[in-house]
């Protein structure tokens, strides 16, 4: 621990609980090290990202069953590369049966530079920018989400590599309020099942191609 930063530099499982104000958990492990963090009833607020993963093989973030966990940065977040409440430069998986509340006060709620997998859990995400800002690939399965973003709601976008920027959604109940795009993929967008409602946006669903294989309801509002 150094000043207001707790650094995780080795592989392992780390269980975190309780409240903190002004402390960042930073994951800076070797590229061969997988890091598993279990959130077990956490409320974390910080000037910059509450959790920031800058190096590791893969980071796993588990929401403990029955717990509510909250992460927030601040409007004065000075880290332009990690302008989110939760940031990962490496592949990130979020799973579990708990609840995660995210408040992105500087820009984004969750920002992932590589691939983001989300399996299970309930999510309430607000952001002054994008709720989800993912670079390469976004897969969301078996979740319940309420999203309120001033810009894009759920976004994966890669301007440099057209082979990525893909999104896969299955068995979710997701409600999005967005100032710009509700659900956006620069690559292929595939929806297999679930209910997706975009209450307010300039574009409800956007992708290089959009494939809807099933689902109870896929609805969106396109405002002009």
Where are these regions (language model features)?
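Beta-strand/loop edge motif enriched in small/polar residues
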Residues: 68-73, 78-86, 102-105, 126-128, ...
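Extracellular beta-helix/beta-solenoid repeat scaffolds
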Residues: 14-75, 86
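Surface-exposed, flexible loop/turn segments at secondary-structure boundaries
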Residues: 69, 140, 182, 191
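Conserved small/polar residues in nucleotide/adenosyl-binding loops
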Residues: 221-224
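Intrinsically disordered, low-complexity terminal regions
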Residues: 1-14, 70, 218
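Short, T/G/N/S-enriched strand-turn elements that build extracellular solenoid repeat scaffolds
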Residues: 3-8, 23-31, 47-53, 107, ...
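Detector for repetitive beta-architecture
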Residues: 13, 24, 34-36, 41, ...
């Amino acid at each position: 621990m150094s000043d207001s930063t707790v650094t995780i530099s080795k592989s392992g499982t780390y269980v975190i609980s309780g409240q903190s104000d002004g402390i960042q958990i930073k994951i800076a492990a070797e590229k061969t090290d997988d890091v598993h963090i279990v959130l077990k009833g956490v409320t974390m607020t910080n000037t910059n990202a509450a959790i920031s993963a800058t190096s590791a093989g893969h980071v796993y973030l588990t929401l403990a069953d029955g717990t509510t966990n909250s992460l927030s940065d601040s409007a004065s977040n000075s880290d332009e590369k990690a302008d989110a409440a939760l940031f990962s430069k490496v592949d990130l998986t979020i799973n579990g049966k708990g609840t995660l509340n995210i408040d992105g006060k500087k820009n984004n709620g969750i920002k992932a530079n590589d691939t983001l997998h989300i399996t299970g859990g309930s999510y309430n995400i607000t952001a002054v920018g994008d709720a989800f800002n993912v670079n390469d690939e976004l897969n969301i399965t078996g979740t319940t989400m309420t999203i309120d973003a001033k810009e894009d709601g759920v976004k994966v976008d890669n301007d440099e590599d057209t082979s990525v920027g893909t999104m896969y959604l299955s068995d979710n109940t997701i409600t999005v309020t967005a100032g710009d795009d509700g659900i956006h993929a620069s690559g292929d967008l595939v929806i297999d099942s679930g209910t997706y409602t975009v209450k307010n946006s300039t574009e409800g669903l956007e992708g290089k191609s959009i494939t809807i294989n099933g689902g109870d309801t896929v609805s969106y509002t396109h405002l002009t």
